[in-house]
Regions:
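Charge-dense, helix-prone N-terminal extensions
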Residues: 1-121
Length: 121
């Protein structure tokens, strides 16, 4: 049986530590790390992902994604999924966001630990 692109993306990304899934409220499937949305899927058609604007512009220039039509001047971008091969490219984009969100959370946690240690001694 051939699984759809969205199923492949959801199965992989949801298996990463700390990732949760939920409804976007607009008919999509949201994938998050903690309180940070990594992106969301619109069925097997496309994925929308938020990136820092500079990174988004580079990914669009590299033709790995396109401008997000509803928010063309934001950091959001869109990646079409025409098959399982595209699922791998979308998973790679989610991994980039996951690594960034996880690193930010770890830095934040380390900072909190340092602040707490100052008051403990």
């Amino acid at each position: 049986m051939n699984e759809g692109a969205a199923t492949a993306v959801e199965r992989e990304v949801a298996s990463w530590t700390g990732v949760t899934t939920g409804d976007t409220g607009r008919g999509g499937l949201k994938l998050s790390y903690g309180k940070v949305e990594l992106g969301h899927l619109h069925g097997d058609s496309f994925a929308d992902l938020p990136f820092p604007k500079k990174a988004r512009d580079e990914l669009i220039e590299e033709e790995r994604a396109s401008v997000h039509p509803p928010l063309p001047n934001s950091g959001w971008m869109r990646r079409r999924m025409d098959g399982t091969g595209d699922a791998e490219a979308v998973i790679e984009l989610f991994r980039m966001n996951y690594d960034r969100a996880k690193a930010r959370a770890e830095r934040s946690s380390s900072g909190a630990d340092l602040r707490m240690n100052r008051y403990e001694g």
